[in-house]
């Protein structure tokens, strides 16, 4: 009786692994996802891993799962990097193989555990040269050990990637990771993938779209965990508390970002000027200084801005909206920073002090103007006669000598 495809005895089928159902994002792709999409990805990957474990497939916990459980960003994980004095990462077995211990002993433990019933004769060792062909060796466990032992030194000197596969289809799938070819395309959104399993995983997102709805505001969500987190907006729940200052937050990711205030950590560095930032979004905004990009355009007058917040403030010029009101005198402003400066009039606060003479000022701009008395700086120059002045008002008065203008009339 012939065995049907997929039966336990079929050598073509192989074992399902976490690598078959995982989706990996680059830094650029991860930053394109919004908060809800990142949470959905996190939930789907964790659920996939739990499903594999529940099916009795013995897989050790991948670094990606550990990272997601700790609410870290998954693109931080470096895969398939093999450099001097670093362990070889056999991602198919999800086990580190330290060079000083030797690969032979490690494989003798791993292979029987992972491929015990299929036998060693079915194993193939491939030395994958990035963007190139693969060298194949078939045979028993001795040949496997010999192949890896002879190539061990080369592994740490080149950018080759050594992987062990239980079937030829797995090795072909692995090659696509090096070539970068994406043959599988989503018909709905047009996004392409290297592997059909990744496309299937992506399509699950479509089937889950808007399955869960908030009873409070009616907003739809793709998964129940995202809905549960959303409900905190209505309940005001803030389960994540900073151990340093006691401040509480609705999201764990917000707490992670907040902690950098205390630690001073700035993990995001501008490649152009070397300036570092605590948030990736701040770095993205900063980069526009170098590129000159202004993606936010006013529909009313066509003026463009590099920051969305700048566009929001600008729009109030057209609408006349002034959402920030002074509690002391009732005067309204279109910008929170303008209200903050205005409040100083009522409090009498003068936080900006001149180091030269000790005189204090309410505004930083007034202090900067005052400093010119000490420095002698005269930044305002007359185009007519080249005479320079410390203040713009002095230049304006001077210009009337050339124009003959007499703006002040006796009533």
UniProtKB/Swiss-Prot annotation:
InterPro entries reported in the protein's UniProt record: KRAB, KRAB_dom_sf, Snail/Krueppel_Znf, Znf_C2H2_sf, Znf_C2H2_type
Keywords, alphabetical: DNA-binding, Metal-binding, Nucleus, Repeat, Transcription, Transcription regulation, Zinc, Zinc-finger
Subcellular location: Nucleus
Source organism of this protein record: Homo sapiens (Human)
Main location: nucleus
Entry's family note: Belongs to the krueppel C2H2-type zinc-finger protein family.
Zinc fingers (C2H2-type) by residue: 156-178, 184-206, 212-234, 240-262, 268-290, 296-318, 324-346, 352-374, 380-402
Protein name: Zinc finger protein 679
């Amino acid at each position: 009786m012939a065995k049907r495809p997929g039966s336990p005895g079929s050598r073509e089928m192989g074992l399902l692994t976490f690598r078959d159902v995982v989706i990996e994002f680059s830094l650029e792709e991860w930053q394109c996802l919004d908060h809800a999409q990142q949470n959905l990805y996190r939930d789907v990957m964790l659920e996939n891993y739990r499903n594999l474990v529940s099916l009795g497939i013995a897989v050790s916990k991948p670094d990606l799962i550990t990272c997601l459980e700790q609410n870290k960003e998954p693109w931080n994980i470096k895969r398939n990097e093999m450099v001097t004095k670093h362990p070889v990462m056999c991602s198919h077995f999800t086990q580190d193989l330290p060079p000083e211990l030797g690969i032979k002993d490690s494989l003798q433990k791993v292979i029987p555990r992972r491929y015990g019933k299929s036998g060693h004769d079915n194993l193939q060792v491939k030395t994958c040269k990035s963007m190139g062909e693969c060298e194949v060796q078939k045979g028993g466990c001795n040949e496997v050990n010999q192949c890896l032992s002879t190539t061990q030194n080369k592994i740490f000197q080149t950018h080759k990637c050594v992987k062990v596969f239980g079937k030829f289809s797995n090795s072909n799938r692995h090659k696509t990771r090096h070539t970068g070819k994406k043959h599988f395309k989503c018909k709905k959104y047009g996004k392409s993938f290297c592997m059909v399993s990744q496309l299937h995983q992506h399509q699950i997102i479509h089937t889950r779209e808007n399955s869960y709805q908030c009873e409070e505001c009616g907003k739809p969500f793709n998964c129940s965990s995202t809905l549960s987190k959303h409900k905190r907006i209505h309940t005001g729940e803030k389960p994540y508390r900073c151990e340093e200052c006691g401040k509480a937050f609705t999201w764990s990711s917000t707490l992670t970002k907040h902690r950098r205030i205390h630690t001073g950590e700035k993990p995001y560095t501008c490649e152009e000027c070397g300036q570092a930032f605590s948030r990736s979004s701040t770095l993205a905004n900063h980069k526009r200084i170098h590129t000159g990009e202004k993606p936010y355009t006013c529909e009313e007058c066509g003026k463009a801005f590099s920051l969305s917040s700048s566009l929001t403030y600008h729009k109030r010029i057209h609408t006349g909206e002034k959402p920030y009101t002074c509690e002391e005198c009732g005067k309204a402003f279109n910008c929170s920073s303008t209200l903050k400066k205005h409040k100083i009039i009522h409090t009498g606060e003068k936080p900006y002090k001149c180091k030269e003479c000790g005189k204090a000022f309410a505004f930083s701009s007034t202090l900067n103007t005052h400093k010119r008395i000490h420095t002698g700086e005269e930044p305002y120059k007359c185009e007519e006669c080249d005479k320079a002045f410390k203040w713009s008002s002095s230049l304006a008065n001077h210009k009337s000598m050339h124009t003959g203008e007499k703006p002040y009339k006796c009533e």
